[in-house]
């Protein structure tokens, strides 16, 4: 299912023409199967288009457009996981790589507010400048810090689910 020109134009109006594409070569790069699954296919279904929003306002506008036009959407940051793949046709990809800012580091209460594409290495470097540390999961320092924190409480050394002495 190819996007209608007016729908594609609406996505361009939100993120700019340089931050949306339906080029088959680029869509195929997003369709490489990223996880271990029982199927032998090397590719998942293609997204209808890929968008690269820069902030929450653009994310909200993309979601509104998807809802208006009966499209599904799938957002991902660094993309390490099969949950980033489309389940079928009619899906718009929100690649959040432009959302890579550390908004706040609260040293007193030991938390950070980050955008989705902030990777552990970036966060750790800023924390170390302040004498702080974070738990970098087994996924590695090139993975986004946000999804794992939201999904699994940031690992075994997190403040709220700790087995470690550092939180006393």
Feature roles, as predicted:
Residues 75:
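Short, basic/aromatic recognition patches that contact phosphate-bearing ligands
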Residues 1-64, 80-110, 125, 139-153:
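N-terminal flexible segment immediately upstream of the FAD-binding catalytic core
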Residues 117:
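Extended, alpha-helix-rich binding/interface surfaces that flank or overlap catalytic cores
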Residues 114, 127-168:
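A gly/ser-rich beta-alpha-beta helix-loop segment of oxidoreductase catalytic cores
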């Amino acid at each position: 299912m190819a996007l209608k020109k007016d729908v594609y134009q609406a996505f361009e109006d939100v993120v700019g023409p340089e931050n949306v594409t339906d080029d088959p070569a680029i869509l195929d790069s997003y369709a490489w199967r990223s996880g271990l699954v029982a199927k032998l296919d090397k590719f998942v279904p293609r997204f209808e288009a890929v968008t690269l929003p820069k902030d929450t306002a653009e994310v909200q506008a993309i979601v509104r457009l998807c809802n208006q036009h009966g499209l599904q959407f799938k957002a991902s940051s660094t993309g390490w996981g099969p949950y980033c793949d489309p389940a079928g046709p009619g899906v718009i990809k929100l690649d959040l790589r432009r959302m890579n800012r550390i908004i706040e580091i609260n040293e007193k209460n030991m938390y950070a507010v980050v955008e989705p594409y902030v990777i552990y290495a970036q966060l750790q470097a800023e924390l170390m400048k302040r004498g702080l540390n974070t738990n970098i999961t087994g996924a590695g320092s090139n993975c986004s810090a946000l999804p794992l924190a939201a999904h699994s409480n940031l690992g075994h050394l997190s403040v709220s689910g700790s087995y470690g002495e550092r939180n006393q």
